[in-house]
Design a protein with these regions (language model features):
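Cytosolic juxtamembrane helix and N-cap/initiation of the first transmembrane helix
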Residues: 1-25
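Hydrophobic transmembrane helix segments
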Residues: 21-62
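Juxtamembrane "helix-exit" motif on the non-cytosolic side of transmembrane helices
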Residues: 35-39, 103-112
Length: 150
C-alpha cells in the first residue's frame, strides 16, 4: 500500500474520532438541556418550549451517543471476520439511520418555522452531519481493506 494511501486512511480515522466526539457532545448537550460556562451558553439543538416530544429528543440524544461509541471501535484490530462483518453491517444501518435523523430534523424545523410564519434557516449543520455520517461507511471499509482503493 502506498504511503499516501495509508496516510489518508489515518486522516479518515481521525475524522471518525472527531465526529464521534462531536456526536457525544451533541447527545450530552441535548440530555442536560444546554451548557452554561460563564458567559458562554450553548443551547440545546431543540427549543424545549417548541418541541412537545421530549421522549423522542432523549432517544435521539442516546442514539447519538451510541452511534459515537460505534465509531470508536478499533475497526482495524478486529480479527474475527464474522464479528467485523456484523459490526460493519450495524455501522451501515446506524449511519443510514443517522442520515435519516438529520433529514427528519430539517423537515421538522421547516414545519415549526412554517407554523410560526417564519422562514426556516438553511440546514448547513445538518447537511454536514449527514455527509459525515454517511462517510463513515467507506472510511471503515477502506481502513479494513485498503486494497479496494486501488
Amino acid at each position: 500500500m502506498p504511503d499516501n494511501t495509508a496516510q489518508r486512511i489515518r486522516y479518515g480515522r481521525l475524522i471518525s474520532v472527531a465526529f464521534g466526539l462531536l456526536c457525544i457532545g451533541l447527545g450530552l448537550n441535548g440530555l442536560i438541556g444546554g451548557v452554561n460556562l460563564g458567559s458562554l451558553h450553548i443551547p440545546p439543538r431543540w427549543d424545549p418550549a417548541v418541541v412537545t416530544f421530549p421522549v423522542a429528543l432523549r432517544a435521539e440524544c442516546w442514539f447519538f451517543i451510541a452511534y459515537a461509541c460505534l465509531l470508536f471501535f478499533p475497526w482495524r484490530r478486529i480479527e474475527n471476520r464474522k464479528v467485523w462483518n456484523g459490526l460493519f453491517a450495524l455501522l451501515c444501518v446506524a449511519s443510514v439511520l443517522f442520515a435519516f435523523t438529520m433529514i427528519c430534523e430539517v423537515m421538522a424545523k421547516n414545519y415549526i418555522a412554517q407554523n410560526a410564519h417564519l422562514k426556516a434557516k438553511i440546514p448547513v449543520f445538518q447537511a454536514v452531519l449527514l455527509f459525515l455520517g454517511l462517510g463513515q461507511i467507506p472510511i471503515e471499509l477502506f481502513s479494513r481493506k485498503p486494497e479496494l482503493l486501488d
